[in-house]
């Protein structure tokens, strides 16, 4: 294998998506990483048992990357990009995770919290998401139900459901209060998120303290799942319509993201002649774009070959 290029060291230890280009500028591969530097560095490691990757790496002439605010955002960015264009070394259109939403029904008679594959408006019902990874989202719902037993709070509960609600601390809590608590977490309100994670962590530690290790492991999975669904991400927004291009530039490199109906659909980079760094985007996009324009300029100055 060729020596590990200097461009790898320029990548941050942060989640994001990356792509490799050949010397003609063609995109060879798009991937995602929980830690960009470590993941991309692995392509210059031991590939003896990965012949297809060895062939690809001989063609790589440039590295590009988008730093994301979370691993969940990176997963969505990869999925959205691969749905529109499948580079020759990618094998799966869109990715492996199944997109799902969370459905919160706060009706007093039959409140429910669960997964939904589509948004179907109904009185008293809110949808959150979409999220990637049905198993993770199901675990997040389990964790939230553990703290806020909405499904066991209606007046038509069985004796078993009433007992479960009592054990989970929701026996006398009104449905509206439980639903509001769940919505606050899923709306990513900082205090609500911190309180929910702290409560699950306390239960995990208590289970471990009594050597209930399977229960503690399950709680740890629920903690990680709640963190997944509340993680910041802007590259897939439900309900947004219309087209929008957001751009940033610096050091002769311009980064342009094309957003279509709330989803990132194209990621473009090109040289530019603007001497002063800048952005053209709504405020919520500016930090994201600025850091990625700066990274694009650093990587452009460090070709692989």
PLM region descriptions:
Residues 1-305:
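Conserved catalytic/ligand-binding micro-motifs in nucleotide and anionic cofactor chemistry
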């Amino acid at each position: 294998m060729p020596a590990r290029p200097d461009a790898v060291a320029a990548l941050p230890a942060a989640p994001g998506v990356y792509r490799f280009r050949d010397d003609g500028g063609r995109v060879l591969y798009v991937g995602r990483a929980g830690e960009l530097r470590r993941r991309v560095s692995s392509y210059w490691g031991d590939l003896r048992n990965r012949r297809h990757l060895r062939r690809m790496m001989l063609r790589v002439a440039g590295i590009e990357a988008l730093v994301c605010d979370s691993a969940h955002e990176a997963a969505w960015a990869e999925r959205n990009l691969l749905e529109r264009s499948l580079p020759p070394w990618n094998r799966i259109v869109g990715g492996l995770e199944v997109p799902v939403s969370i459905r919160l029904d706060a009706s007093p008679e039959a409140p429910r919290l669960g997964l939904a594959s589509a948004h179907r408006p109904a009185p008293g019902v809110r949808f959150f998401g979409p999220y990637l990874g049905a198993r993770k989202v199901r675990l997040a719902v389990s964790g939230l139900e553990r703290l806020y037993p909405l499904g066991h709070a209606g007046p038509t509960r069985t004796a078993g459901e009433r007992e479960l609600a009592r054990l989970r601390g929701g026996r006398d809590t009104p449905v509206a209060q439980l639903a509001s608590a769940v919505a606050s977490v899923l709306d990513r309100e900082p205090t609500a998120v911190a309180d929910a994670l702290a409560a699950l962590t306390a239960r995990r530690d208590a289970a471990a303290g009594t050597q209930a290790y399977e229960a503690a492991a399950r709680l740890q999975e629920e903690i990680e799942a709640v963190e997944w669904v509340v993680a910041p991400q802007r590259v897939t927004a439900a309900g947004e319509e219309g087209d929008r291009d957001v751009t940033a530039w610096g050091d002769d490199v311009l980064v342009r993201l094309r957003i279509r109906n709330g989803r990132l659909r194209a990621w473009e980079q090109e040289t530019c002649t603007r001497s002063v760094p800048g952005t053209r985007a709504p405020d919520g996009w500016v930090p994201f774009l600025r850091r990625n324009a700066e990274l694009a300029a650093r990587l452009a100055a460090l070709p692989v070959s």
